[in-house]
Amino acid sequence: MNLTYNQFEILVAIEQRQNEKLTQRTLAKQTYVSLGIVNKVMEELSDLELITLKNNSTYELTLKGYEWLEPHRVKRAIFIAAGFGSRLVPITLNTPKPLIRVHGKLIIETLLDAVIDAGIKDITIVRGYLADQFDVLLKKYPMIKFITNPIYNESNNISSLMQVKDNLENAYVLESDLLLSNPRIIRKYEYTSNYLGIKMDVTDDWCFTLKKGIISKMSVGGENVFQMVGISYWNKEDGKKLATHIEKVFKKPGGKECYWDEVACKDYISDYKVMVRQCDKEDIVEIDTFNELKQIDKVYDI
């Protein structure tokens, strides 16, 4: 029951599009591999009896296909939503950034809807600034659990991860202020620990350098890198390690000022093999400033 990475990615892509006519070109675009690899892997999946062709280029997973994916199921989602969002003043003076409406929908809703559509029911939101306002989400999402970060305003986001450090196995960790346009990037299954990233020739933002597909460096700015997107997944083994490592970093001098992402991708990078899962810049947007918000939703341009 051991799938290669390419077999897994194409199997998941087919599972997401089972009722659609599906060309190999579509699969190549979604999985960021060549047509030749898609053709080869499709033959392998067919030979393994993991997929079957229904008609008119419509594929579906067999029972065996689902059984092979099951060990990779995502079990929970952790939302980090405690911060103030100072760069979006004045609107964040009265509203937490994840609860800002864009085109009539709360930013965090774009993520929550995708998580729920992926069958993930164990959902925790770590809140802090104007915490009670998040209760509005319970009407639509009664399954949500809230944890309050009491020191959000005197520490960096590692303090939010301290609140949930024992719940990171088989878990997505999501920044809650990302406006999601492509819900398919939130999936029922993940192959191994990974960060979402956008391939860039050059960026001045947080980014990853890769070595043989594994994150070898995390930095601010770089060339031929993947710009970091604030959605990651942690498998069972890495989730356990993170619980220990987050606490160690948090308790060291100056540890409260750290970004939690630095724990696995900088401080203890040799203990992890974290991949980058590629996405496009059109898939997801972080609205950093009030001017950017006005450009995206003209209702604020007054």
Spans of features found by a protein language model:
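Short amphipathic alpha-helical interface segments
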Residues: 2-22
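Short, cationic-aromatic polyanion-contact patches
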Residues: 3-6, 23, 55-72
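N-terminal glycine-rich phosphate-binding loop and ensuing alpha1 helix
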Residues: 14, 71-131
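Short amphipathic alpha-helical interaction segments
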Residues: 32-44
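A short, conserved structural fragment
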Residues: 46-56
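Conserved alpha/beta core of the MobA/IspD/sugar-nucleotide pyrophosphorylase nucleotidyltransferase superfamily
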Residues: 66-77, 228-302
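Conserved beta-loop-beta/alpha segment of the NTase-like Rossmann-fold superfamily
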Residues: 135-206
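Conserved core of the sugar-phosphate nucleotidyltransferase
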Residues: 182-254
